[in-house]
Amino acid sequence: MQVHLSALGCRLNEAELQNWATSFQKVGYSLAATPEMADLIVLNTCAVTSEAARKSRQTVRRFHRSNPEARMVVTGCYASLEPQKLEQIMGVDLVVDNSDKDVLVDKVKEVLDIPVMPEFATEPGESALFARNRERAFIKIQDGCRYRCTYCIVTVARGEEKSRTIDDLIDEINKLHAEGIQEIVLAGVHVGGYGSDIDSSLYQLVENVLERTEMPRIRFASVEPWDLGENFFELFANPRLMAHMHLPIQSGADSVLRRMSRRCRTEDFAELVNQARTQVAGFNVTTDVIVGFPGETDEEFEQTMQYIEQVGFGHIHIFTYSDREGTKAARLPNKISKEVKKERSRRLHE
């Protein structure tokens, strides 16, 4: 029995795929490289933008067309926000909410009742990651977010923060390293908020990873800039911690950041970047910017353009704002026209 696992969107979705790969193997599945080869398809969807939601629906239909005989399980943020719509799409056999992701394999066994051989589907020592030709592993360190940025639907889809224990994470990392993994990416919805619910912190987690594992290369997924304390960059004295962080600013205008309910001012962000570059040689900062947020004036956009040039990011992920039903931003007045958003995006891409 073969299962094809596919993720859209963030690195956290990819990390969850890796966990399911291991769990499916333990109950007798082997991993299919393509949906056409699979008896079961599991899709981890995204809903961060309206385009991501559209792509999630499109992918479900494409997978069903490519293999109409396969059973299909759909989970992830879009599945949590719009389960009724997914259930009406031909080919979808089971929709699993984000809150049930940890027991997804059990739900598949219980609801779909697909018979499999009760044995491992790979040779001893072969991991699910290598079956998927991967040498980098994404580690899910936490889920959920306690903040509510006005444009963000992910916090609605993912719920409250829940961190894994340091010991649990260390065990997983050491196991992956023993299997040959050379690089890990610490991922989550609110990576910088790790430990808020278990009296710990991201700093403590990284300290433990550096001290208790021999993983050669360690990276972070996106981290909110306000979560990093003054001593955080001291950790990069260890060369195993790669000198790069993705710190989303979203706008270079403080007035826009306030409407977004972001917890960082542009001045503070610039100081943080300067601190990182001062303490860590060759430190690379990448970021996210949203163009066309409701009410964004020409002056505010020009402030963003100037700020980007001032900070000098290594790379910028540019997102064109779109309303997401259920967010505060969707109810804000003074929406920006498609033409203006397109032009602002073009200018940022230059």
Each model region followed by its residue ranges:
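Contiguous mid-protein beta-loop-alpha structural module that forms a pocket-lining wall or clamp
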Residues: 296, 311-313
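Conserved SAM/AdoMet-binding glycine-rich loop
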Residues: 73, 81-82, 86, 178-298
